């Protein structure tokens, strides 16, 4: 992320673990109504939402020109490419399982790589690139930036969360509205605004009072959506945006603690490696080792943390591993 904002480093690692809990629920506890409503469809939705805001803040807290944007996009592309290679065997296995021929698999892979992420959690990286570009283009027109991206966010939430659909041709090409244009651009724009007004974020009393109310509202919105559509998985809701903005604002405004580069890198690795860990844990059934959902969930969380620790530790000796963080 960048030095000098230790609070955000700590927040990012906590949110990465929250996202692991979300995906654990989707993998191993999919029949658990409590987990579905009170983790997956509510509090866990602030994870990636906050990532976008923090990324926008940290990028735009300094003057941003073409060279800096190019450098940032290249860094994200490199990270995206490295982890795409890691997950490529799983993608190939899925194509073989689904019976897709080689041309069909290539088209599907390229389409997902551009519009939806090469693996289900990788959408954040591809979306972040698009969101950064959108915000950079309008960075000197703050009112237009916020108005346009807020409109896109509203459309994105209504289509992805509330089930209002675009024409079928849109999804045939772009697959989803859970992307950098409709969801990421507004959040990165908010991060830029926080960077622009950072000096005014010291009066945190009102923010601290609003946060619990916003969290309650998040559970109300998520609970109501889940009640009317029990199978829907919420990615971002209106209240998760509000909670994320307040939470990141508070963490920026508080006195900053010192955090090492290792802490920053751990959160990235936890987020990017945990689906691979869960796939490995899930293979235990095929090996005749039958574990219940709770045990699989616990092992997945611990192994994700240990794997991240190992990768970060090895990166101090092998610089090539830096490409994965």
Describe the function of each predicted region.
Residues 1-325:
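Alpha-helical transmembrane segments and their immediate juxtamembrane cytosolic regions
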């Amino acid at each position: 992320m960048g030095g000098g904002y230790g609070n955000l480093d700590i927040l990012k690692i906590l949110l990465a673990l929250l996202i692991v809990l979300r995906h654990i629920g989707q993998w191993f506890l999919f029949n658990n109504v409590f987990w579905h409503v009170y983790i997956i469809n509510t509090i866990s939705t602030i994870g990636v939402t906050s990532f976008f805001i923090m990324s926008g803040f940290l990028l735009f807290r300094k003057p941003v020109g073409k060279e800096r944007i190019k450098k940032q996009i290249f860094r994200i592309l490199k990270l995206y490419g490295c982890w795409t290679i890691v997950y490529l065997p799983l993608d190939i296995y899925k194509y073989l399982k689904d019976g897709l021929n080689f041309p069909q698999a290539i088209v599907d892979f390229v389409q997902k790589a551009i519009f939806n992420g090469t693996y289900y959690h990788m959408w954040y990286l591809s979306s972040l690139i698009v969101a950064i570009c959108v915000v950079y283009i309008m960075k000197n027109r703050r009112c237009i930036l916020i108005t346009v991206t807020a409109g896109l966010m509203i459309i994105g939430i209504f289509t992805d969360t509330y089930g209002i659909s675009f024409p079928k041709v849109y999804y045939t090409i772009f697959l989803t509205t859970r992307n950098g244009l409709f969801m990421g651009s507004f959040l990165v724009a908010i991060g830029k605004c926080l960077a622009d007004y950072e000096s005014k974020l010291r009066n945190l009393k009102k923010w601290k009072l609003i946060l619990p109310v916003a969290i309650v509202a998040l559970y109300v919105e998520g609970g109501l959506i889940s009640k009317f559509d029990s199978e829907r998985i919420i990615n971002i809701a209106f209240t998760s945006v509000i909670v994320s903005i307040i939470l990141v604002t508070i963490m920026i405004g508080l006195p900053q603690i010192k955090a090492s580069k290792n802490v920053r890198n751990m959160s990235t690795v936890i987020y990017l490696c945990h689906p691979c860990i869960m796939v490995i844990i899930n293979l235990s059934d095929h090996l005749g080792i039958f574990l219940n959902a709770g045990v699989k969930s616990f092992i997945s969380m611990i192994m994700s943390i240990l794997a991240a620790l190992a990768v970060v530790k090895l990166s101090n000796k092998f610089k090539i591993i830096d490409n994965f963080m």
